Amino acid sequence: MSDFQKSFSESTSSIKFDEKYIDTSVQPNDIGVAEQWAVKTVADPCVGNLATPVNSGYFTKAFINNLPFYREGISPNFRGLETGAAFGYLLYGPFTMTGPLRNSEFALTAGLLATIGAVHILTALFVLYNAPGKAPNVQPPDATVNNPPKDLFTRAGWADFTSGFWLGGCGGAVFAWLLVGTLHLDSIMPIIKNIWTAG
């Protein structure tokens, strides 16, 4: 407990409430089944990290801990490669179908170039995050992620993650571009393009 927290708890310990404002008909044990849904602090309540039914539930913990950023047993470079591939693959569709060249014959290539440009911008932001004086912030364990990866939150780990993200993002965009350019999708491409066409 920090000095501020000690002084705060000491200053509030002498607070007495007027008896007419205290409801004695409800006791903590009266809550019953709803007690399992109560919000509890994970560690320090002043940090604001609370264990709620959403962030500490089984499905949420299983989903978040299986994402490449938090999965155990993989290197920072592979974390970046997998995350970047997902970003590149998923960003290609919106850039292709809603971009300014969506009704031209260059829509697929323009979407590819726009996606690679967005991956470059995100990579530059990751590099800038690692550039200032101190190393990246190490995430403490919380209600959702019990064991965050220690090797990722170092300068070398973050640099490996960034290079993997760039390679995976460009590769994911190229894979989506090749997939959309195949012949079996030619019959549905006009339908998809007409969904977002304004006039």
UniProtKB/Swiss-Prot annotation:
Keywords: Membrane, Photosynthesis, Photosystem I, Thylakoid, Transmembrane, Transmembrane helix
A UniProt-annotated Pfam family: PsaL
GO cellular component terms given for this protein: photosystem I reaction center; plasma membrane-derived thylakoid membrane
Membrane topology label: Multi-pass membrane protein
Transmembrane segments: 108-128, 165-185
Cross-referenced InterPro entries: PSI_PsaL (IPR003757), PSI_PsaL_sf (IPR036592), PSI_suXI (IPR022980)
Subcellular compartments: Cellular thylakoid membrane
Family label: Belongs to the PsaL family.
Name this polypeptide is given: Photosystem I reaction center subunit XI
